[in-house]
């Protein structure tokens, strides 16, 4: 397969995603096919975002690593020393993707390391490995192109996470601001007693202890529930089951108490 055909194969994968998140496993499979090498997409913390195996490596440690989808911490940290594409590293290199305890079996093993960079920061590493055949310029062009695509995808996911976090925080702040002074006081006492993200409580007991009416507690819970911040369910004489749905809620509530 010529370079242009291989590039088109990678492009076809991106175009088929059509604005949806690129599946790192599918991306790895395609890279594995066009570059003809074992492919590992490694995050900053060593998490295996995606991988594909072209040549099986019979080694228990490697199998466990793939099963856990996690690269060793020391190896991951060492990868940060590689700031530009380093190709055809042999089994004696500290960056080899072959098991060092089996150097005699993988003497012809070659590894290529491609940093994944986006937005001016290191986002991860693309690790390629194969036996007996050097990585040529065409392979490196495809690898660097793939690393750029992966970097853009990681940045997109990070932006979505930040956006979702901001949205969750805004929902909580709006829900809390909709509470009256007595309702806010009731909510503070409820979650002080709950002491966690879910549990069972008796509203009448809290109302008596704090000196507010039960209707204030009911209204406060209803407001938070309609905002999607909590879930509440009456269990009759047993009390009310409450579960926090928005993980920003308790933090924002705690901030109010300290201010």
UniProtKB/Swiss-Prot annotation:
GO MF, any single term: GTP binding
Residue ranges of the region described as GAF domain: 1-155
Keyword Cytoplasm in record: yes
Localization annotation: Cytoplasm
Modified residues (Phosphoserine): 215
DNA-binding region(s) in UniProt: 203-222
Gene3D superfamilies cross-referenced by the UniProt entry: 3.30.450.40, Winged helix-like DNA-binding domain superfamily/Winged helix DNA-binding domain
GO cellular component terms attached to this protein's record: cytoplasm
Keyword Kinase: no
GO BP, one annotated term: negative regulation of DNA-templated transcription
Principal location listed in the UniProt entry: cytoplasm
Keywords: Cytoplasm, DNA-binding, Phosphoprotein, Repressor, Transcription, Transcription regulation
HAMAP family: HTH_type_CodY
Membership in a protein family: Belongs to the CodY family.
Function: DNA-binding global transcriptional regulator which is involved in the adaptive response to starvation and acts by directly or indirectly controlling the expression of numerous genes in response to nutrient availability. During rapid exponential growth, CodY is highly active and represses genes whose products allow adaptation to nutrient depletion.
The protein's name in its UniProt record: Global transcriptional regulator CodY
Lineage: Bacteria, Bacillati, Bacillota, Bacilli, Bacillales
Gene responsible for this protein: codY
């Amino acid at each position: 397969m010529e370079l242009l055909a291989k590039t088109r194969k990678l492009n076809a994968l991106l175009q088929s995603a059509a604005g949806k998140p690129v599946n790192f496993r599918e991306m790895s499979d395609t890279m594995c096919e066009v570059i003809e090498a074992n492919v590992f997409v490694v995050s900053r913390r060593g998490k295996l975002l995606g991988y594909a195996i072209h040549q099986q490596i019979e080694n228990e440690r490697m199998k466990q690593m793939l099963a856990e989808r996690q690269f060793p911490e020391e190896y991951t940290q060492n990868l940060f020393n590689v700031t530009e594409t380093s190709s055809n590293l042999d089994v004696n290199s500290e960056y080899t993707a072959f098991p060092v305890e089996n150097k005699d079996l993988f003497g012809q093993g070659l590894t290529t390391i491609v940093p994944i960079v986006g937005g001016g920061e290191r986002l991860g590493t693309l690790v390629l490995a194969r036996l007996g055949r050097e990585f040529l310029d065409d392979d490196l062009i495809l690898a660097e192109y793939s690393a750029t695509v992966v970097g853009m995808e990681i940045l997109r996911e990070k932006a979505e996470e930040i956006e979702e976090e901001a949205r969750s925080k805004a929902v909580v702040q709006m829900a809390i601001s909709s509470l009256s002074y007595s309702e806010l006081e009731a909510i503070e006492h409820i979650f002080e007693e709950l002491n966690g993200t879910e549990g069972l409580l008796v509203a009448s007991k809290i109302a008596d202890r704090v000196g507010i009416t039960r209707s204030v507690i009911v209204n406060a819970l209803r407001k938070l529930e309609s905002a999607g911040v909590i879930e509440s369910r009456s269990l009759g004489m047993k009390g009310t089951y409450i579960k926090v749905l928005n993980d920003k809620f308790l933090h924002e509530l705690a901030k109010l108490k300290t201010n």
